[in-house]
């Protein structure tokens, strides 16, 4: 028999049969080896048909194995297993060839092998029994009137089921979420589908606005019979393009698969509507040398009206792929899908609420849905409603569900504490010194208390979990009853529908309410429970904060205190600049209270003053206070932007230039951390054209980068520092450190000479930093010495400096034109260097105190006080 007269699947089965012959040490390829191989082929048609006939294929494979183990084996060094085809196998293949001819096929396929096995193999006959006619019917249905004209015929069998999914059937089975709104777009789609020619709508809109949902909504309307008569008998198949392309090994196989799909659609005589999501992928799909792409294969059928098709794609991809192919474009009718507003999104979320409650086993408050729509619209700017709002709700539900499945935080902390104490206890038991024994007694008492607390908490958690499970069970039961009601109404089973609507469902609703009320009474308010099962607006705010880094969740007590004392915290780090500190801290408080202008940055300030007076330090202090780290400050040194072309480094190189893919230093940093302090240091050093980029940031709180993406600056604090007018400030400052009106006017004149009015007009405030006074210097000395003590803490050494020595340090290092920086250098020389020499010269024990005083010669004396043992 010619192996080339067999399909690839049968050839593969023969090769596998050789391997099975080797496994069982058989010289011949027996029937059972071939049939077992046919069962184990990838996407085996042989196995699929038997499974549909409800035959236990696993047991049948075991029966084949059992038969193979009874054949006589051949052993030896040069034995070639599976070298010959046995007489029974030959008989089976001859029979398969006869079936091939009777089906008018060109190649022996798997269904021929199956029919031949039923006729010739006793084991197969035994397991098939009286299901021969059933198997024949299944084969006829699978073939669908096709003939085997290629060596890969399986791609043509039930192509739609293989490469698509029936949306109408999924709606009937209750697998689809409800579609809320979008009535106008669905009506437009129905109108286009009802046309005689060019009845192929293409849904165009941004990602996440609900294009696929419109098609799902149409499928739901077909099930509810809420469509014109011409669409009542229609079904919608979603084509999976990736499945069509995947595994197409041979030249022309992709086209063959697509042709089989289109043939089934054509033979349905308009009953099947094909939905192709991401339809732009058709253009160029499967195109190789000399091959035709999928888009060109669709055109003739679309033009003749033989193919009813709905496409969906985004605006950019439609422009890039479909519009270029004008012949394909004119065969589709565009349906624009715009982003819904916040109110419509809230309606959509309310419609989905019940499905998410049942799926996650939680309760979603209405204010959580409102918060999801509003917060996602305001803070998640690079995505679209309703997708981003639905994602927020889903994530919040998943968070609560995860918490419900694991130990509550309170119990988890107690468990960890118990474990920690037990480890410490076992370590201390090995020690014999008195402090260790004393600590062991204290520890054992604490451990006993913690274990008691642990037991009590565990008991509460178990009780609450049990009650929540009952509520969840009742919710799921209610949901399945509602689905059954829809099915009964669709099928016209009015008796069942009436029983469900007026009997079962009201009863379940009452029971659910009773369970929830009992749960509420027994466990108290939501805030008192160990296990949270409610999704509120706080959870939504937490998720937004996680995704964006912007604090939108409700203020906790510690954060309230932190914000109210922000001004005091900044005053400790920045000395002598009260006005600047108050302006910045007030801007942060306004933003966190939610009353700032939502379309502008939190605050934009220009700090003017001499070098070393605390301009940059204030920006660092603010970042450190808000984020507990100076790393959250985006620092741009404007001295690097002295050339006109350097502005491209802020927003990214234009298309075609090197570095276009990398993005801009400023825009990329803000995209990653939307809530941050931006410090533009030494702005006067930059080229004047660089400031034109800042215009829309300061006014609208946004900036478009080189890739056309809008970057949101509404949650940033922008601080610019400059030394413009510092000479005027130094020369005209009053003894008390106050700045006169004339001095301020002179500084402003210098500023106007450098900056354009449109830049200055957009800033919230221009703050003049006054030169530091001698009194300020003594406070800065305290700060520097505190930092030094912090560094010495690791070595358990501390320094004490007398007031007289501090005063001398401040006076000696005082240089008004240089600010605080000379003082830092002076302290390094006078205190840090001598202490470092002492530490290296003699090993100072832990607890050493170094006392620093001023002697009569105006020099510093260092006295080492070692701890008494």
Swiss-Prot record:
GO cellular component terms, semicolon-separated = cytoplasm
One Pfam family named in its UniProt record: AAA_lid_9
Q: InterPro entries recorded for this chain?
A: AAA+_ATPase (IPR003593), ATPase_AAA_core (IPR003959), Chaperonin_ClpB (IPR017730), Clp_ATPase_C (IPR019489), Clp_N_dom_sf (IPR036628), Clp_R_dom (IPR004176), ClpA/B (IPR001270), ClpA/B_CS1 (IPR018368)
Main location as per UniProt: cytoplasm
Q: Where in the cell is it found?
A: Cytoplasm
> The Clp R domain covers which part of the protein?
3-145
Q: Which domain of life is it from?
A: Bacteria
Q: Does the keyword Chaperone apply?
A: yes
Name the segments for region: Repeat 2: 85-145
Gene Ontology biological-process annotations? cellular response to heat; protein refolding
Protein name (record) = Chaperone protein ClpB
Q: Tell me the gene name.
A: clpB
């Amino acid at each position: 028999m010619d192996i080339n007269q067999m399909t690839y699947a049968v050839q593969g089965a023969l090769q596998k049969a050789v391997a099975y012959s080797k496994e069982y040490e058989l010289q011949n390829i027996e029937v059972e080896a071939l049939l077992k191989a046919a069962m184990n082929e990838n996407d085996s048609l042989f196995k699929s048909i038997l499974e549909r006939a409800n035959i236990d294929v696993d047991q049948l494979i075991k029966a084949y194995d059992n038969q193979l183990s009874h054949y006589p084996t051949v052993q030896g060094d040069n034995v070639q297993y599976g070298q010959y085809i046995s007489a029974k196998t030959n008989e089976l293949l001859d029979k398969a060839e006869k079936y091939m001819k009777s089906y008018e096929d060109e190649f022996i396929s798997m269904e021929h092998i199956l029919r031949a096995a039923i006729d010739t193999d006793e084991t197969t006959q035994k397991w098939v029994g009286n299901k021969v006619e059933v198997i024949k019917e299944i084969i006829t249905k699978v073939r669908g009137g096709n003939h085997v004209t290629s060596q890969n015929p399986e791609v043509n069998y039930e192509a739609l089921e293989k490469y698509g999914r029936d949306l109408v059937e999924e709606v009937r089975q209750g697998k689809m979420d409800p579609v809320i709104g979008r009535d106008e777009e669905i009506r437009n789609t129905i109108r286009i589908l009802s046309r005689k020619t060019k009845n192929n709508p293409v849904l165009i809109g941004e990602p996440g606005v609900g294009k696929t949902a419109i098609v799902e909504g149409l499928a739901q309307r077909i099930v509810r019979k809420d469509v014109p008569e011409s669409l009542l008998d229609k079904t919608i198949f979603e084509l999976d393009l990736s499945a069509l392309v995947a595994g197409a090994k041979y030249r022309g196989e992709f086209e063959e698969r697509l042709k089989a799909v289109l043939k089934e659609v054509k033979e349905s005589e308009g009953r099947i509507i094909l939905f192709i999501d991401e339809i732009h992928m058709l253009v160029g799909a499967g195109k190789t040398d000399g091959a035709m792409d999928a888009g060109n294969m669709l055109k003739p059928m679309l033009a003749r009206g033989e193919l009813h098709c709905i496409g969906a794609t985004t605006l950019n991809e439609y422009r890039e792929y479909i519009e270029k192919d004008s012949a394909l474009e004119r065969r589709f009718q565009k349906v624009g899908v715009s982003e819904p507003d916040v109110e419509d999104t809230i309606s959509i979320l309310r419609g989905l609420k019940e499905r998410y409650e049942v799926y996650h086993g939680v309760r979603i408050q209405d204010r959580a849905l409102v918060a999801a729509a509003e917060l996602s619209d305001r803070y998640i700017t690079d995505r679209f409603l309703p997708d981003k709002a639905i994602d927020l709700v889903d994530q919040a539900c998943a968070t609560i569900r995860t918490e419900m499945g694991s130990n509550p935080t309170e119990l988890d902390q107690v468990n960890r504490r118990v474990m920690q104490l037990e480890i410490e206890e076992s370590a201390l038991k090995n020690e014999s010194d008195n402090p260790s024994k004393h600590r062991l007694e204290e520890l054992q008492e604490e451990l006993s208390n913690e274990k008691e607390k642990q037991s009590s908490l565990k008991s509460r958690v178990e009780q609450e979990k049990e009650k929540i499970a009952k509520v969840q069970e009742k919710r799921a039961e209610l949901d399945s009853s509602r689905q059954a009601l829809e099915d009964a109404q669709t099928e016209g089973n009015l008796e069942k529908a009436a029983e469900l609507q007026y009997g079962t469902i009201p009863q379940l609703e009452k029971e659910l309410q009773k369970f929830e009320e009992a749960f509420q009474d027994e466990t108290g308010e939501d805030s008192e429970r160990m296990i949270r099962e409610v999704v509120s607006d706080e959870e939504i705010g937490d998720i937004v904060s996680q995704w964006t880094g912007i604090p939108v969740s409700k203020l906790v007590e510690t954060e309230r205190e932190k914000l109210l004392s922000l001004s005091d915290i900044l005053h400790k780090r920045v000395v002598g600049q009260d006005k600047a500190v108050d302006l910045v801290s007030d801007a942060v408080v306004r933003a966190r209270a939610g009353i700032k202008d939502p379309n502008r940055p939190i605050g934009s300030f220009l700090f003017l003053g001499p070098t070393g007076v605390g301009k940059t330090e204030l920006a660092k202090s603010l970042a450190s206070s808000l984020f507990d780290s100076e790393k959250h400050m985006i620092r741009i040194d404007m001295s690097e932007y002295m050339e006109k072309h350097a502005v491209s480094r802020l927003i990214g190189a234009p298309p075609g230039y090197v570095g276009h893919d990398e993005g801009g230093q400023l825009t990329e940093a803000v995209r990653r951390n939307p809530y941050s302090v931006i410090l533009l240091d030494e702005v006067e050093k930059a080229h004047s054209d660089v400031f034109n980029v800042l215009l829309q940031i300061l006014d609208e709180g946004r900036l478009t980068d080189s890739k056309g993406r809008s970057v949101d600056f509404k949650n940033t604090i922008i601080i610019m520092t400059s030394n413009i007018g510092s000479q005027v400030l130094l020369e005209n400052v009053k003894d008390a450190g106050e700045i006169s009106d004339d001095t301020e006017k002179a500084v402003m004149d210098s500023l106007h000479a450098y900056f354009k009015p449109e830049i200055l007009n957009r800033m919230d405030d221009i703050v003049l930093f006054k030169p530091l006074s001698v009194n300020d210097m003594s406070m800065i000395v305290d700060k520097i010495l505190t930092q030094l003590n912090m560094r010495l803490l690791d070595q358990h050494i501390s320094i004490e400096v007398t007031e007289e020595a501090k005063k001398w340090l401040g006076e000696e290092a005082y240089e008004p034109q240089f600010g605080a920086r000379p003082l830092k250098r002076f302290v390094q020389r006078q205190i840090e260097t001598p202490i470092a020499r002492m530490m290296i010269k003699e090993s100072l024990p832990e607890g050493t105190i170094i006392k620093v005083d001023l002697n009569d010669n105006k020099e510093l004396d260092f006295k080492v006080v070692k701890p008494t043992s």
